[in-house]
């Protein structure tokens, strides 16, 4: 009986108390940022993505949480914009092409440079190693090591290995994001 009442209360709350969160999605070009947004928004995967020029904003609703996603271009000329769009968000999602080992060092440097900005202090970070379905893709343990994530001490940091194409670990990624809809923004 108590479980039924609890479920009814949760349902009732979901009708009237909607959560909103804002996140910024950054990472080097061709890591799969826009594809990730499309997969969580509609479940659609496409091989033929056009690189993001500047930024895109999209709202995605999952349950009673509306996620406002800033998808920022990853080409070198757009990286100076990353900090501006990361200020005041609930979480930063940093996407890596886990199968492109040649770009890992550049990706690590960009992530650490971004997180060194004082205005972004304390904002939780979710690092996603995309394209785990490809041969030689780094797994979570390798990503944590190669990206030197253990050196990041001033905030919560989490790392998942995902595949937008196969939709691997998209569910746990969404769970993490929804949990952080309650994170305070400054």
Curated annotation (Swiss-Prot):
One of its GO terms (biological process) is antigen processing and presentation following phagocytosis. Its main location: membrane. It is found in: Late endosome membrane; Lysosome membrane; Cytoplasm, Cytoskeleton, Spindle; Cell projection, Axon. Ubiquitously expressed. GO terms for cellular component: axon cytoplasm; cytolytic granule membrane; cytoplasm; cytosol; early endosome membrane; extracellular exosome; late endosome membrane; lysosomal membrane. It catalyses: GTP + H2O = GDP + phosphate + H(+). Keywords: Acetylation, Cell cycle, Cell division, Cell projection, Cytoplasm, Cytoskeleton, Endosome, GTP-binding, Hydrolase, Isopeptide bond, Lysosome, Membrane, Nucleotide-binding, Protein transport, Synapse, Transport, Ubl conjugation. One of its GO terms (molecular function) is GTPase activity. Ubiquitinated at Lys-141 by RNF167, leading to its degradation. Changing residue 2 to F: No effect on localization and acetylation. Belongs to the small GTPase superfamily. Arf family. This is ADP-ribosylation factor-like protein 8B. It comes from Homo sapiens. The lineage of its organism: Eukaryota, Metazoa, Chordata, Craniata, Vertebrata.
């Amino acid at each position: 009986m108590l479980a039924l009442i609890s479920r009814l209360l949760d349902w009732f709350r979901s009708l009237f108390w909607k959560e909103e969160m804002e996140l910024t999605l950054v990472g080097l070009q061709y890591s799969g940022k826009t594809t990730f947004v499309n997969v969580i928004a509609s479940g659609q995967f496409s091989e033929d993505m056009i690189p993001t020029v500047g930024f895109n904003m999209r709202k995605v609703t999952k349950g009673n949480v509306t996620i406002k996603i800033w998808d920022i271009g990853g080409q070198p000329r757009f990286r100076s914009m990353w900090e501006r769009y990361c200020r005041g968000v609930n979480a930063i999602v940093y996407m890596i092409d886990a199968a492109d080992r040649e770009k890992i060092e550049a990706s690590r440097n960009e992530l650490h440079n971004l997180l060194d900005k004082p205005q972004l202090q304390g904002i939780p970070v979710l690092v996603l190693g995309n394209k785990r379905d490809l041969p030689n893709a780094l797994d979570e343990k390798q990503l944590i090591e190669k990206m030197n994530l253990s050196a990041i001490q001033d905030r919560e940091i989490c790392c998942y290995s995902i595949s937008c194409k196969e939709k691997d670990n998209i569910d746990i990624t969404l769970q993490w994001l929804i949990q952080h809809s309650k994170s305070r923004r400054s």
